A protein has these predicted regions:
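Formylglycine-dependent sulfatase
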Residues: 1-203
Length: 203
């Protein structure tokens, strides 16, 4: 009741309702692993949150190459597939989302980035366009929404699967303005969800 999400609430009313749905994990990486593969995280080798690695041993942890994602299945059946946003399932190129069925990837590999500079907790740029690290200007939430709209527009005449993994409301808690201002308790992600929903209706 405290945080208003009228647009997400509307999507829930108008969409499919799951009455018995469980998350396989309580934190990011294992949950994403389960969502994408349909398997328990222990079976896919991701039992904890992946932090930005600083030694070689930690770099090897990530989604294993034999895992099959829903993106791979859909891509094999004629769908265009894209991930726009957060990956958080491994940092090496062998863990890259484009090796797991996503034909397009724009976003970041780590758990969170600065919303303005797109740098990770160590100050390194973590913004990818395909297989290339390539920073883009813009506030992360707005940028991911705009990129998603562009993808929908480009693929409106063919079957596609767009997995939008927004950064919001993950830390760091940063708004789109330079100054921190007090606003009505409405999630930034709610506004962007509505923007995408309205955009889909147009097309």
């Amino acid at each position: 009741e405290y945080i208003k999400t009228p647009n997400i609430d509307q999507m829930a009313r108008e969409g499919m309702m799951f009455t018995d749905f469980h998350s396989n994990g309580s934190v990011s990486s294992p949950t994403r692993c389960g969502l994408l593969t349909g398997r328990y995280q222990q079976r896919a080798g991701l039992e904890k949150v992946l932090l930005v690695p600083r030694d070689d041993k930690d770099k090897e942890v990530g989604l294993q190459s034999e895992e099959i994602t829903f993106a791979k299945i859909l891509g094999d059946n004629g769908y265009r597939t894209a991930l726009i946003g957060k990956w958080h399932l491994g940092y090496l190129q062998k863990h890259h989302p484009m090796n797991f069925g996503f034909q397009k990837f724009v976003g970041f590999k780590s758990g969170n980035v600065d919303y303005q500079s797109h740098r990770n907790r160590y100050g390194d740029v973590d913004w990818w366009d395909g297989l290339e690290m390539k920073n883009m200007p813009g506030y992360t939430t707005t940028l991911l929404t705009t990129l998603s709209e562009d993808y929908i527009k480009e693929n409106k005449d063919k079957p596609f699967c767009l997995y939008i993994a927004h950064a919001a409301p993950h830390s760091p808690m940063q708004g789109p303005n330079e100054k921190a201002i007090r606003t009505e308790a409405t999630l930034e992600g709610d506004k962007n969800s509505d923007q995408i929903r309205k955009f889909i209706k147009i097309w």
